[in-house]
Amino acid sequence: MSSQIDAVILAGGMARRMGGDDKGLVELNGEAMIKHTIDRIKPQVKEILINANRNQTRYAEFGFKVISDEHTGFLGPLAGMITAMGQTDADYLLVVPCDCPLLPTDLVPRMLAAIKAEDAEIAVASDGEYEQPVVLLLKPSLRDSMKAFLEAGERKVDFWYAKHHFVVESFSDQPNAFVNVNTPEQKQRLAMEITK
Ligand SMILES: Nc1nc2c(ncn2[C@@H]2O[C@H](COP(=O)(O)OP(=O)(O)OP(=O)(O)O)[C@@H](O)[C@H]2O)c(=O)[nH]1
Ligand SMILES: [Mg+2]
């Protein structure tokens, strides 16, 4: 039987570098940033959860369930993952950020194959050089481990997965796949690239 995969799109941060504008909702080439991410991910998973801590009504307009961090206080991406892991019955949860509009269209099959080949618990994407700590495929049963880690005051996703059996899947064949839009300047630059 094939594995069921759900996804959470993380849009729960404060987006300080974007000047406080909600990063998932800023417009990139006529569409909300998160819509680009949704379009990349939707064909690859069963259900999508959108993790947001403000503008929840606006996020709901994309047609997916919106979930807010169960640990309040903007504790970082782990808080969004923990919440999503508690709300899925899938075999694996794909975690992606809302601000990577060019994610690979073959992200899930490659991450899943990497996990299965090594009987690992987690796959982490890499651009060939750097690991992408918020682009993960993981087993929802890891929730208790992640929750304990967060509640011990830890915040770094890569420190958490280092405690588990993880594999790195490289997407060096797709140099722009993890282009990350954190500032208005980066958004401008990407908009010009896309329309070229
Ligand atoms: N649920 C949740 N997600 C978060 C939180 N902080 C960051 N994220 C998400 O984690 C991903 C990576 O974080 P950043 O790129 O630093 O985003 P950010 O923290 O909103 O932006 P900055 O304030 O500029 O650092 C983004 O998809 C964020 O939405 C948080 O407190 N809760
Ligand atoms: Mg941040």
UniProtKB/Swiss-Prot annotation:
Keywords: Cytoplasm, GTP-binding, Magnesium, Metal-binding, Molybdenum cofactor biosynthesis, Nucleotide-binding, Transferase
SUPFAM superfamilies: Nucleotide-diphospho-sugar transferases
Reaction it catalyzes: Mo-molybdopterin + GTP + H(+) = Mo-molybdopterin guanine dinucleotide + diphosphate
UniProt xrefs under CDD domains: MobA
EC number from the UniProt entry: 2.7.7.77
Enzyme class: transferase
Binding sites annotated in the UniProt record for Mg(2+): D99
GO molecular function: GTP binding; metal ion binding; molybdenum cofactor guanylyltransferase activity
Compartment annotation: Cytoplasm
Self-association state and partner proteins as the record states: Monomer.
Biological role stated in the UniProt entry: Transfers a GMP moiety from GTP to Mo-molybdopterin (Mo-MPT) cofactor (Moco or molybdenum cofactor) to form Mo-molybdopterin guanine dinucleotide (Mo-MGD) cofactor.
NCBIfam families according to UniProt: molyb_mobA (TIGR02665)
Family, per entry: Belongs to the MobA family.
Descriptive protein name: Molybdenum cofactor guanylyltransferase
Annotated organism of origin: Shewanella baltica (strain OS155 / ATCC BAA-1091)
Gene that encodes the chain: mobA
